[in-house]
Amino acid sequence: MTRLSVTTPFGRRSLTLAHVASQVVAKARPPEKAVHKWNIFRAICTAKNALGVPERALAVLDALLSFHPETVLTGEGLIVFPSNHQLSLRAHGMPMATLRRHLAALVDAGLIVRRDSPNGKRYARKGRAGEIEFAFGFDLAPLVVRAEEFEALAAEVAAEARALRLVRERITICRRDIAKMIATGIEEGVPTQAGGQGPADWAEIHQLYRGIMIRIPRIATRQALEPTADELS
């Protein structure tokens, strides 16, 4: 039987199954694994919507990472222990209530783990040689364990953004070409029908074009835009 040791939060904060899962993930970290903290932070920023992390929570995560002295996260010393006042200053003066809300969001998203002391304070105990023997604060270990997941999500988001940009470019080029062809057709009196087929005149073509364009929503996904791009092509 596997023994599971879980750290419970101080005070009125509740312990959820998601919090337990995050602690299990943190404990599963291979001791030799190392990641560049700012590379992972950038990946999380890119994948924030997929991870359900609010924009301002990223400012708090940025501040937390700045309290870790190393650029590479590895080994056991991944707990940072700034006070809320120190965190607020690093997060550009974020109000305390907002700071606490976004810290909770980071915990709920499984990006950090709370390691609360008996009195709820954040601090570290050092040995005789000055090394940290144990600390209470926020454990950054999930960032190391889930690094590949964050990078994969960021790559998916970037690929989707590129695909959306390309389909928007297709539509822009088609709109330009169609508008110029309609203008030229009207000015030059070019016939619109070949063998009795097709729209009766350029005004009808323009109406068909307008009908396609007004169906495009202001904020559209790639899946919504691709049929329009195909129709205009």
Task: Spell out what each predicted region is.
Residues 179-233:
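Electrostatic interaction modules used in gene-expression and signaling proteins
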Residues 129-166:
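Short, amphipathic alpha-helical interaction segments positioned at domain boundaries
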Residues 55, 84, 109, 133-137:
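Extracellular structured ligand-interaction cores
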